[in-house]
């Protein structure tokens, strides 16, 4: 049971690195633009949510 938080943090780090370094299949311009727009809108929705607006992706002013 004590290793569960460590695994959870590792999963978060892996998911962050996946978003930060997209694979070669996302290098197509239109696909990458669509992905970035979708991610940006998801981040904006999250930043408007008082529960998770403190996440690192949100601007500090909000």
Curated annotation (Swiss-Prot):
**Record's keyword terms, sorted:** Cleavage on pair of basic residues, Disulfide bond, Secreted, Signal, Toxin
According to the record, the signal peptide region is 1-21
Instruction: Recount the PTM note.
Output: Contains 2 disulfide bonds.
* Record propeptide residues: 22-38
Protein family per UniProt = Belongs to the teretoxin A (TA) superfamily.
The UniProt comment on domains reads: The cysteine framework is I (CC-C-C). Alpha4/5 pattern.
Q: State the protein's name.
A: Teretoxin Tan1.1
Source organism (scientific name): Terebra anilis (Auger snail)
The organism's taxonomy opens as: Eukaryota, Metazoa, Spiralia, Lophotrochozoa, Mollusca
């Amino acid at each position: 049971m004590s290793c569960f938080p460590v695994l959870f943090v590792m999963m978060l780090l892996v998911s962050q690195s996946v978003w930060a370094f997209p694979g070669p299949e996302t290098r197509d311009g239109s696909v990458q633009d669509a992905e970035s727009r979708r991610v940006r809108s998801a981040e904006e929705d999250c930043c408007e949510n008082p529960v998770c607006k403190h996440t690192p992706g949100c601007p500090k002013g909000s």
